[in-house]
A protein has these predicted regions:
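ATP-dependent carboxylate activation and anion-phosphoryl transfer catalytic cores
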Residues: 4-235
Length: 235
């Protein structure tokens, strides 16, 4: 279990309770103490690196809208960051990847609150939400992943990366709309949206039976707009 201490006076009791609970449950009273963030955003940075020390970042994504600690809507750029913050965290991330000697695509995830970034983890792969980065940069991340894995050099530097407009992704899940419990079954009618600056990634079709064995996500709706408001209207 976890305990929150919002002041020094609350720490001794919370610490004792956490130790006692850990001891009773796991026969060890060791506990881990870290800073508690009241209302953070979930912000992640997309990086791309080749095998020759060349690294670029492709901007950030805001993945704060979640249910059951799972992302449901993502957008780029993050509306909470300014250009200075974006440039600063971008340099930190690319410098770190160079020092690590990392190669291929990767995503570095942070919690962000009150102007400060707190590292969570790095995913050494593409993310579900990578299409919105493709929308605003014009870079095909799947293609680049294959190229650098095959030993190719990056064809551009950070100065060549330009961000245009705003993009959002909405995950479509086969779930009960009230309980969010996975809801497998036959799709009686499927009509995917389309049009300018609209993309749907899915394998669904009318008559398809959604199986009960996998994740409930069955489609991704990705939209682009010149502004955030335009993007929201299209979504």
């Amino acid at each position: 279990g976890m305990r929150i201490a919002r002041g020094a006076d609350e720490l001794p009791e919370a610490y004792a309770q956490a130790r006692a609970e850990a001891k009773a449950s796991f026969t060890s009273d060791e506990v881990y103490i870290e800073k508690y963030l009241e209302n953070p955003r979930h912000v992640e940075m997309q990086v791309l690196a080749d095998k020759y020390g060349n690294v670029v970042h492709l901007g950030e994504r805001d993945c704060s809208m979640q249910r059951k600690n799972q992302k449901v809507l993502e957008e780029t750029p993050c509306p909470a960051l300014n250009d200075e913050q974006r440039k600063k965290i971008g340099k930190i991330v690319t410098d770190a990847m160079k020092k690590l000697g990392y190669s291929n695509v990767g995503t570095i995830e942070f919690l962000y609150e009150n102007g400060q970034f707190y590292f969570i983890e790095m995913n050494t792969r593409l993310q579900v939400e990578h299409p919105i980065t493709e929308m605003v940069t014009g870079i095909d991340l799947v293609r680049e992943q294959i190229r650098v894995a095959a030993g190719a050099h990056l064809n551009y530097t950070q100065d060549d990366i330009h961000f245009d407009g705003h993009a959002m992704e909405c995950r479509i899940n086969a779930e009960d709309p009230f309980t969010f419990v996975p809801w497998p079954g036959k799709i009686t009618q499927w009509h995917a949206p389309g049009g300018l600056w609209t993309r749907v990634d899915s394998g669904m079709y009318t008559g398809y039976t959604v199986p009960p064995y996998y994740d409930s996500m069955i489609a991704k709706l990705i939209v682009f707009g010149k502004t955030r408001n335009g993007c929201l209207m299209r979504l």
